[in-house]
Every structure is written in structure tokens, then in C-alpha cells.
């Protein structure tokens, strides 16, 4: 078991959270696994639909624009040639085969678990008591949210907040308070976590319930 301290809205220690040792078990080549997962996320965001028309596909008459000789101009075959306005494109992009990258569910869970464990080992993950997300701010106050970050010694840079989906109706005060802070990278929910956001975030603030639910999900192997 690994014990992590959790903090209340005042930055005081409010107890500890237990994480099983299985959460930190590395499967195979961890760095390669994370790389493959992040490459898959970026590749699958692309549309792969860029398409241009060549000279045989554009809508133009095949009639010669002017006679072959006597004008002093270079001879031209038709207005579909690429040198004319509205002509075909030479070597333009075409839709390729489906280049979406598939990553197994087991590999995805292992990559996210490794990213979270690295944040824990480098002291860049702060566990907040559930009350911080649900009842700490009845109305949005950016100053109070910033005070919470400073009291927990969170570096105000690239912060990702993660909450449990069950708190979605009660965390509006905190979400709106964080919206105006440039140091906050995003606000997401445990089961919807994106590995790319997690990897690019410098610090993570996660609620106790979200951490327990996410740890159980990543270890047990339940379907996404």
C-alpha cells in the first residue's frame, strides 16, 4: 500500500488515501507504451480527408483556349491545365487508406496508470478532499481558488484538475473559479481522462473519490 496525503480547501492535511501496490506495477517497456499511446491519440485526431482535383477531375471544357499558331503565346491544350486559374492541382493531397491507430484497451489503461504514477513519484499530484470540489465555493471566486493552490504548494503552471463524475452537479463553483486562471490547463472527470492532457500537464489536482475510482478502474480491467 502507498499512502498519499489529502488536503482540504485551507491547505491543511485532512487524512490519507491508500493506493494498492498493483497501481504502480509497470508492464513491459513503459516509455514505449506511453509513446505509442500518445502517438495514437494525435494520429486519430487527424481527419485524413484532404482531397484535391487533378486536371482530369476539374470542371472545364477540353476546347483549346486559343489556336495553336499565330498568337505568339505558348501553345495550350485546355484550361484544366495546372498553370491556369481553376485548373487541376499537381501532386495534391488525396485521401489515403484509413490511418487511424488502434491501441488496445489494456495498453491504454497501463499507459494512463504509468503517467499517474510518475506524477505521484515526482510530487506533482495533489489529492484534494472531496469537499474541495463539491462544497468549498458556493459562488465562483478566482481569488479563493488561487489561494487554495498556493496553500497546497502547487506550482501555478499547467495544472489539470480531475474530479469524479458524480460531483458534476456540485462542483460548478470551483470550475468557474478556475476558468479565469491561465495556470489551469483543464478540468476533466476521472473516466473521461485523456492521456495526452495528463502527459502535457505539469501538475495534477485530483479529488479523493476520482483517484480511488480511477485506480480501481485501471487495475481491475473493467470496460471503458
From Swiss-Prot:
Any one of the GO CC terms: ribonucleoprotein complex
Molecular functions (GO terms): rRNA binding; structural constituent of ribosome
Region described as Disordered: spans on this chain: 54-74
One of the Pfam families matching this protein, by short name: Ribosomal_L4
Keyword DNA damage: no
Record field: transmembrane: none
Keywords: Ribonucleoprotein, Ribosomal protein, RNA-binding, rRNA-binding
GO biological process, one term: translation
Record flagged with keyword Ribosomal protein: yes
SS bond list: none
Record-linked InterPro entries: Ribosomal_uL4, Ribosomal_uL4-like, Ribosomal_uL4_dom_sf
HAMAP family according to UniProt: Ribosomal_uL4_B
Quaternary structure and partners: Part of the 50S ribosomal subunit.
Family: Belongs to the universal ribosomal protein uL4 family.
Record function comment: One of the primary rRNA binding proteins, this protein initially binds near the 5'-end of the 23S rRNA. It is important during the early stages of 50S assembly. It makes multiple contacts with different domains of the 23S rRNA in the assembled 50S subunit and ribosome.
UniProt xrefs under NCBIfam families: rplD_bact
Name this polypeptide is given: Large ribosomal subunit protein uL4
Source species: Chlamydia caviae (strain ATCC VR-813 / DSM 19441 / 03DC25 / GPIC)
Amino acid at each position: 500500500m502507498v499512502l498519499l496525503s489529502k488536503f482540504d480547501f485551507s491547505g491543511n492535511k485532512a487524512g490519507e488515501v491508500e493506493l494498492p501496490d498493483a497501481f504502480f506495477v509497470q508492464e513491459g517497456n513503459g516509455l514505449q507504451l506511453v509513446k505509442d499511446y500518445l502517438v495514437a491519440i494525435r494520429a486519430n485526431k487527424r481527419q485524413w480527408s484532404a482531397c484535391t482535383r487533378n486536371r482530369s477531375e476539374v470542371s472545364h471544357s477540353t476546347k483549346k483556349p486559343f489556336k495553336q499558331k499565330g498568337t505568339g503565346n505558348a501553345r495550350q491544350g485546355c484550361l484544366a491545365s495546372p498553370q491556369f486559374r481553376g485548373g487541376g492541382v499537381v501532386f495534391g493531397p488525396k485521401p489515403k487508406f484509413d490511418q487511424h491507430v488502434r491501441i488496445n484497451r489494456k495498453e491504454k489503461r497501463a499507459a494512463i496508470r504509468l503517467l499517474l504514477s510518475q506524477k505521484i513519484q515526482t510530487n506533482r499530484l495533489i489529492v484534494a478532499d472531496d469537499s474541495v470540489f463539491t462544497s468549498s465555493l458556493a459562488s465562483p471566486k478566482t481569488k479563493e481558488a488561487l489561494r487554495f493552490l498556493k496553500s497546497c504548494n502547487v506550482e501555478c503552471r499547467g495544472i489539470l484538475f480531475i474530479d469524479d463524475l458524480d460531483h458534476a452537479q456540485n462542483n460548478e463553483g470551483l470550475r468557474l473559479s478556475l476558468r479565469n486562471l491561465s495556470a489551469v490547463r483543464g478540468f476533466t472527470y476521472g473516466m473521461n481522462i485523456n492521456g495526452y492532457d495528463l502527459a502535457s500537464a505539469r501538475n495534477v489536482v485530483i479529488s479523493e473519490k476520482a483517484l480511488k475510482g480511477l485506480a480501481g478502474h485501471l487495475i481491475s480491467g473493467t470496460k471503458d
